[in-house]
Amino acid sequence: MALSYRVSELQSTIPEHILQSTFVHVISSNWSGLQTESIPEEMKQIVEEQGNKLHWAALLILMVIIPTIGGNTLVILAVSLEKKLQYATNYFLMSLAVADLLVGLFVMPIALLTIMFEAMWPLPLVLCPAWLFLDVLFSTASIMHLCAISVDRYIAIKKPIQANQYNSRATAFIKITVVWLISIGIAIPVPIKGIETDVDNPNNITCVLTKERFGDFMLFGSLAAFFTPLAIMIVTYFLTIHALQKKAYLVKNKPPQRLTWLTVSTVFQRDETPCSSPEKVAMLDGSRKDKALPNSGDETLMRRTSTIGKKSVQTISNEQRASKVLGIVFFLFLLMWCPFFITNITLVLCDSCNQTTLQMLLEIFVWIGYVSSGVNPLVYTLFNKTFRDAFGRYITCNYRATKSVKTLRKRSSKIYFRNPMAENSKFFKKHGIRNGINPAMYQSPMRLRSSTIQSSSIILLDTLLLTENEGDKTEEQVSYV
C-alpha cells in the first residue's frame, strides 16, 4: 500500500530544492501520522494552498504579463509600418517598447515561477545570474529611455532649429545605443560576481541579490539606475514647462506681421552649384524690410495668412498638452519605481531593520515596477491619434493604412521661389517629398509676374512659431503647416 512507504524513501526520489517548498514539506512532515481516514482533509488543505497560488499566477498573467507583451508589440509594429511615425523621436519610443517587451517575455514569467516555488529557484543554477542580469538590464533600460526622452523633448522645445539639424535617424540610433550601453554597464556586475551557493546544498538557492554579496551594487546601482535619472527628469520637466510658458507669452504678444520675401539659407540650400545664392522663399517676418509680395489680392492673402498666427498658438497648445502627458509619465514613474528602490536602499543601509520583511516588500514592489513596462506604451501612444488608429487596425489584422482624398488635399502645399532655378534643387525635391509636398506643384514667381497670385497659392510656412530673443540673437523655427 502507498501508506507503507517511508519518508526517507520518498525524499530520495525528489530533488533537494523541490523538497523545500511548502507543498512537499507539508506532505513529509505529516506523512507518518496520517491515517487512511485523514487523507482527504490533509489533501484538501494542500490543494487549497496550491489553488490560491495558481489564482495569483493567473491574475498576474492576465493583468500584467499579457498586456505588457501585447501593448509593446503594437508600438513596435506601429513605428515599423507607419511612415508617418518613422521619425527620430518615435525611434526612442520603439526602443523603449523593445525593452519593456523583453521584460514581459523573459523577466516576468520567471519571476512568476519563483513565486510559485516560494522563492526557490526551479531552473538550472546557471540560469539564475543570467536572469538577474536581464532583469536589471531591461528594467534599467526602460528607466533610461524615459530619462532620454525627457531630455530630448526639452532640447527640441528650447532649441528647435539646432535640435532639428541633429534629429536624424542616424543620430537617434546613436543616442539609443548609448542608452543601452549605459544600461549594460550598470547591470554587468551581476553575472561577473555570480550567485553564492550553499556548499552542502548547491541546488537549494534563492535567486535574489543578497546584501552580503551585492550590497555595494544594490546601493550604487540604485543611484545610477533610478535616482540619477529621477533627478534629471525632475529638472528637465520643470525647464520644459518654463520654456513652453515663455514661448506661449511670446506668441501671444507678437505684433502683427507682413508677408515679405526673405532669404533663408538654413531651410533650403542648393546642392548643384556651391557658389550659387540661397533660394528665397516667401515668409512671415515683420522685423525685416524686404520686398513685399505684389499688391494684387493683398486682402485675400492677408485673410489667408491671418490663420498662421492661430496655428502658432495651436502648436504651442499641442506642446503644452504633450508636456502634460510627460507629467503623467513622470508621476507614474515615481509611483511605480520609488517604493522598490527606496526599499532596496533601506535593505542595504538599515542593519536594525527586519531583513525578512524588507525582502518580502521587495518581491511585491518589483512587480509594481514591472507594471510600468505595460503602462509606458499606453501613456505615450494612446494620446496620439496616429498610434490609436494604427492599434485599431492591427488588432483587426489590417496592417495597411488608408488615406482619403480629402486628407491628401489638405496636406498638399504650394511654395513659390523667387529664384526659378530653385525648382530644380535636388535638396528641396528630396525633402519636399519627405514632408508631403508634391514637386509637381512647385511654381516660380518669375513665371507669375504677369499674373495675379491667387488666394489658393498662399505660402504655408510659419517662421514665427517659436521666436526667442536671447541678447542680440534671434532664432526662428520654420515648420510645415
Swiss-Prot record:
Alphabetized UniProt keyword annotations: Behavior, Cell membrane, Disulfide bond, G-protein coupled receptor, Glycoprotein, Lipoprotein, Membrane, Palmitate, Receptor, Synapse, Synaptosome, Transducer, Transmembrane, Transmembrane helix
SUPFAM superfamilies named in the record: Family A G protein-coupled receptor-like
Tissues in which the protein is found: Ubiquitous. Detected in liver, kidney, heart, pulmonary artery, and intestine. Detected at lower levels in blood, placenta and brain, especially in cerebellum, occipital cortex and frontal cortex.
Lipid anchor positions (S-palmitoyl cysteine): 397
Highest taxon, organism lineage: Eukaryota
Chain residues that bind ergotamine: 135, 140, 209
Residues with site note (Hydrophobic barrier that decreases the speed of ligand binding and dissociation): 209
GO molecular function: G protein-coupled serotonin receptor activity; G-protein alpha-subunit binding; Gq/11-coupled serotonin receptor activity; GTPase activator activity; neurotransmitter receptor activity; serotonin binding; serotonin receptor activity
PANTHER family, per database record: 5-HYDROXYTRYPTAMINE RECEPTOR (PTHR24247), 5-HYDROXYTRYPTAMINE RECEPTOR 2B (PTHR24247:SF31)
UniProt record similarity statement: Belongs to the G-protein coupled receptor 1 family.
Name the record gives this protein: 5-hydroxytryptamine receptor 2B
Organism: Homo sapiens (Human)
